[in-house]
Regions:
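Phosphate/nucleotide-binding beta-alpha loop and adjacent structural elements of enzyme active sites
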Residues: 1-179
Length: 179
C-alpha cells in the first residue's frame, strides 16, 4: 500500500516542468540547490533535461532526515551531486526535527507548528478515513539535527552564486532565506 501511495503522489504531484527552466540558462556551469530533496525527484528531472540540452550543473542536495540518503543511492553515484545530511535554517545550532514515521521522509520539517496545524489535522483525518488500517500515517518522530545558515554554508563551500534554488521544507522556507 505504501508503494501505491508513493506512486500516486509522484504521478500526480511531481512534474518534469522543473527541467523546463533550463531553457532560460546560457551559463554552462550552474549551481543548483535542492533543499528538502527527499527522493531527489527535482534533481533527477533537472539532470535528465540538462542532458537533452548538453548542460551540466553542480548539485547540492540537503535533507536532515537520515532516512533520505537510502533513497538517493543511485543519484549520489553522479559526481556532480553532493548530499548534505543537514538542515538549513536561520541559525547555526541544534534543533528538533520532526518526520512522518509512515512516509519516513515526506512531510518532515523543523517547523514545530506542523503537528498542531488545523490543516494538518484535517488532512490527517481524511487520510485516516481512507487508509484506516494504517493508523500510524500521521505519527511524527522527533530527532535533534544540526542546522546551518545558507550564508554560512555558501561561505564554507566557497559558493558565490546559487543559480537555481528549490526548497520544499514544509514551512521553513522563510527561515532558510533569512539565514
Amino acid at each position: 500500500m505504501q508503494r501505491i501511495i508513493y506512486y500516486l503522489l509522484n504521478k500526480f504531484f511531481m512534474t518534469e516542468a522543473e527541467g523546463e527552466i533550463l531553457k532560460y540558462f546560457k551559463k554552462k556551469d550552474k549551481i543548483v540547490f535542492d533543499i528538502g530533496c527527499f527522493r531527489g525527484n527535482f534533481t533527477k528531472n533537472f539532470i535528465k533535461n540538462e542532458k537533452k540540452l548538453g548542460i551540466k550543473s553542480n548539485f547540492f542536495l540537503f535533507d536532515p532526515n537520515p532516512n533520505v540518503k537510502n533513497y538517493l543511492k543511485l543519484i549520489l553515484e553522479n559526481t556532480q551531486i553532493k548530499y548534505f545530511n543537514l538542515a538549513l535554517d536561520n541559525s547555526n545550532s541544534k534543533k528538533k526535527f520532526y518526520f512522518n514515521t509512515f512516509f519516513e521522509a515526506s512531510g518532515s520539517s523543523l517547523n514545530t507548528v506542523i503537528r498542531d496545524d488545523k490543516k494538518w489535522k484535517s488532512t490527517r483525518k481524511i487520510f485516516m478515513q481512507i487508509f484506516q488500517p494504517f493508523k500510524k500515517i500521521g505519527d511524527f518522530a522527533e530527532i535533534n539535527v544540526q542546522t546551518q545558515t545558507l550564508d554560512d554554508f555558501c561561505l564554507d563551500e566557497k559558493i558565490e552564486n546559487i543559480d537555481v534554488l528549490k526548497m520544499d521544507t514544509e514551512g521553513s522556507e522563510l527561515n532558510i532565506l533569512k539565514g
